[in-house]
Amino acid sequence: MTQVQTAAVQPDAIPVAAPAPQRWRVADVVALFELPFNDLMFRAQQVHREHFDANAVQLSTLLSIKTGGCEEDCGYCSQSSHHDTGLKAEKLMDVDAVLDAARAAKANGASRFCMGAAWRNPKERHMPALTEMVRGVKELGLETCMTLGMLEDEQAQELANAGLDYYNHNLDTSPEFYGQVISTRTYQDRLDTLDRVRDAGINVCCGGIIGMGESRRERAGLISQLANLNPYPESVPINNLVAIEGTPLEGTAPLDPFEFVRTIAVARITMPKAVVRLSAGREQLDDAMQAMCFLAGANSMFYGDQLLTTSNPQTQRDRALFERLGIRASDADAMQANA
């Protein structure tokens, strides 16, 4: 009987300063993707248990504080002014309304509150309200995250001074596939914003979207980019494309759910101390596949009935699933990785 051998994947030592040799070559990440499913899951769960409580998941709520009218042409996004999705552009929400939503999220079990604005970048006139939102949400005892588009150095520092815990700015996909999805913002623009966030002392939340028509190698390219950031992000959201009517990616064939689970597992292995977040597109997975995601190393999920402008599984269904799996909601402090 022929024995199947798997490739040994040995990342280099973690660099202490940039520029540095890559820790994860794309070929190494592809080798992880191509492991037999059971082997990949076993390895991911081993890594996960080394650094986190395997039965604890952080609940996050995401609020769109400024919806629609975005200048960017991201092919997946209903909020782009380039696409006819029927979404009406709205102004930035009042601070009090945002804080009311944060209180409701906390009452519903969330320990993390994310605020997203459909902008290319915030204007200086927006900053006082944004920093007030951060301070107000933190006073409620919630972990804070914002995603506002590209930032200047001064804006990143203002958010840091307000106490922002995380700033989300996704790479979206690999450098090779990026141009097929977005033309109004370069890959380097995204990397520059991440550098500004890091330099300001804010934790980085950075992931991507899979299922946009990219190849497995291009998915591996995204993970390689994320894992080779120095340091890699503290928070890594993995989104499953929601093919929204009126966007260029409308009608894109759904990704095999097992490939989504594989991506979660590979993210966990390559970024062992990151919080891997099960994000948009979760409603496309049945309960069994969501359970697989937790087994693969996802330890946070977006919770609530709406995720920006796409639907999310209902909270009652989420609670029922947690009960069936023996998973408990965890606060932000418990999400700190073990050494």
Curated annotation (Swiss-Prot):
Q: Which GO terms describe its molecular function?
A: 2 iron, 2 sulfur cluster binding; 4 iron, 4 sulfur cluster binding; biotin synthase activity; iron ion binding
Please state the Enzyme Commission number of this protein: 2.8.1.6
The protein's required cofactor(s) are namely: [4Fe-4S] cluster; [2Fe-2S] cluster
* Domain Radical SAM core, chain residue ranges per copy: 55-282
Kindly state what the record says about how the cofactor is bound.
Binds 1 [4Fe-4S] cluster. The cluster is coordinated with 3 cysteines and an exchangeable S-adenosyl-L-methionine.
The pathway this protein participates in, as annotated, is: Cofactor biosynthesis; biotin biosynthesis; biotin from 7,8-diaminononanoate: step 2/2
Q: Which residues bind [2Fe-2S] cluster?
A: 114, 145, 205, 277
- Catalyses which reaction? (4R,5S)-dethiobiotin + (sulfur carrier)-SH + 2 reduced [2Fe-2S]-[ferredoxin] + 2 S-adenosyl-L-methionine = (sulfur carrier)-H + biotin + 2 5'-deoxyadenosine + 2 L-methionine + 2 oxidized [2Fe-2S]-[ferredoxin]
Q: Kindly name one Pfam family recorded for this protein.
A: Radical_SAM
Q: Which residues hold [4Fe-4S] cluster?
A: 70, 74, 77
On subunit structure and binding partners, the annotation says: Homodimer.
HAMAP family recorded: BioB
Briefly state the protein's biological role.
Catalyzes the conversion of dethiobiotin (DTB) to biotin by the insertion of a sulfur atom into dethiobiotin via a radical-based mechanism.
Name of the protein in its database record: Biotin synthase
Species annotation:
Burkholderia ambifaria (strain MC40-6)
Recall the taxonomic lineage recorded for the source organism: Bacteria, Pseudomonadati, Pseudomonadota, Betaproteobacteria, Burkholderiales
What gene does this protein come from? Answer: bioB
